[in-house]
Regions:
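Alpha-helical, coiled-coil/dimerization segments enriched in small aliphatic residues
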Residues: 62-65, 149, 185-200
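Hydrophobic/aromatic ligand-binding patch that stacks against planar heteroaromatic rings
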Residues: 85, 108, 197
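Extracytoplasmic substrate-binding proteins
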Residues: 26-35, 104-186
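Bacterial N-terminal signal peptides
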Residues: 5-16
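Boundary at the C-terminal end of the N-terminal hydrophobic targeting segment
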Residues: 19-21
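A short, structured surface patch at a secondary-structure boundary
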Residues: 34-105, 117
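Mobile, glycine- and charge-enriched loop segments
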Residues: 37, 56-57, 73, 169-177, ...
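N-terminal secretory signal peptides that target proteins for export/translocation
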Residues: 1-2
């Protein structure tokens, strides 16, 4: 019960934050939300979570979940994108992680005038809710997102908290391998989404 109340207060706080701070300029509704290019795996996953995947034109290579993403055009790696590759898909809206780059490409996209939103990230339960709320606000489905968060996400976060508080939970040393480059593993470093996932 305590955790449910905590999450409710958290959700209300996030929504008030979106309305009253500088996040508004990033999270306010876009003029055209039908043709989206995504640079960042978590954003792609959120759009699928919200059942809004039909809006997606293309994705970056970190967007590998769910498996249906393999059918979408790729724009390359989130940190080493090209403006030409992105703009060739004729997007009306680009949603990117805060490590989207390089900076020159972001500047080139802004010069063309395509609506680009770089969404900040915090690797916590609050950060997940805040990110979903922001993306939902951009594409104009806040009410739908609230229901999804309440019905689908909250129970999972509650179960996670229950497990962390249980006696069987023990911290272990782990490493998250994102992919293999030849024989060398690409691992999640400090400050990445992967590292945040491990900590949670």
């Amino acid at each position: 019960m305590y955790y449910r109340i905590l999450m409710l207060h958290l959700f209300l706080f996030v929504n008030s934050l979106l309305a009253e701070t500088s996040l508004l300029s990033i999270c306010n509704i876009a003029n055209n939300t039908s043709d989206i290019v995504v640079a960042g795996g978590s954003i792609t996953e959120i759009l699928y979570f919200l059942n809004e995947e039909d809006r997606i034109l293309g994705i970056d290579v970190t967007s590998n979940f769910p498996k249906q993403t393999s059918e979408l055009p790729s724009i390359g790696y989130v940190r080493s994108l090209s403006a030409e590759g992105i703009l060739s898909l004729n997007p009306k809206l680009i949603l990117g992680e805060n490590d989207m780059g390089p900076p020159l490409v972001i500047d080139q996209i802004k010069e063309v005038g395509v609506d680009l939103r770089v969404i900040s990230e915090e690797q916590t339960a609050m950060g997940i809710i805040e990110k979903i709320s922001c993306i939902a606000s951009i594409i104009g489905i806040q009410d739908k997102a609230q229901e999804k968060i309440k019905d689908k996400l909250m129970p999972k976060l509650r179960d996670l908290k229950t497990f962390q508080d249980s006696k069987i939970f023990k911290k272990k040393k782990v490493m998250l391998i994102l992919s293999m480059q030849g024989t060398s593993p690409i691992v999640a470093g400090s400050g990445t989404s992967g590292n945040g996932f491990i900590k949670m």
